[in-house]
């Protein structure tokens, strides 16, 4: 299995280094649910600004303030503790009376707004995230500048970030131990983290191998393609390759790679043979996913950061802004720009 740091680059390995997250204010994330609160219902959506707190900690504190069980507070995604983040929490509080959430106090947190909502906010139920990053101590401004220009056109590999695999790869190691021993895992969180790490690692491997072998945006017979921004896919046939290639070049269609699991992967013929060969050595992880009935799925191989802009504060400091759809990783953008240094080279998002 290829280590995250050794995954193939789309724009070649960066020539310089830089510091990511010298302080929390250098990594700002604003959650975009893609919808507004209903204004009525038994749930309350609460938009929180936080710094130095992880999502679960804040959710538990909110539950305590509202005198409800912790399971009655949900969120769409985890946000990094060592960053400045805006996100929505959802608390089930039936009744007509609206609690005064302006009185909720927690160090490092501030309630920005809240309103009634009809439905529970479920994990993954967000449109995306807006990022504002500051890279400091950049050793090669010209290289970073050119890479930013190239990313606007060609995007970056849509790798799952190193944080998906746990500190020191602990989640992936847990999945491997589980696969090798077949010992039942009762802890639901561990099961989820380990299976997610296994499938993500296999996806990364397929994308890395495709980047090595050929133009990642070159459609081959049997590729599974999806409309940009959509989850469903269809299979490319030889007769359609020229037209499909035009639509891929126009960013109307995205070539996908497998998220391996049980059932058919989605590709056929040449593309399927390539994907199977790319992860042929990882028989234990593949068997684990099938055994645990994790359904195979697809994910776009490339990621195009939207609304990408940047501003050099000086020759060694650059502020970068962009928006990513849910499930994508800002660190997968940063790794195409600089070789990161510091304690926060790999961080949660």
Swiss-Prot record:
Record-annotated TRUD domain positions: 155-303
Pfam families attached to this UniProt entry: TruD
Gene Ontology molecular function, alphabetical: RNA binding; tRNA pseudouridine(13) synthase activity
This protein's record includes keyword Isomerase: yes
Domain of life: Bacteria
Keyword field: Isomerase, tRNA processing
GO cellular component, one term: cytosol
Primary enzyme class: isomerase
Alphabetical list of NCBIfam families matching this protein: PRK00984.1-4, tRNA_TruD_broad
PANTHER family xref list: TRNA PSEUDOURIDINE SYNTHASE D
Protein name: tRNA pseudouridine synthase D
Native source species: Shigella flexneri serotype 5b (strain 8401)
Gene: truD
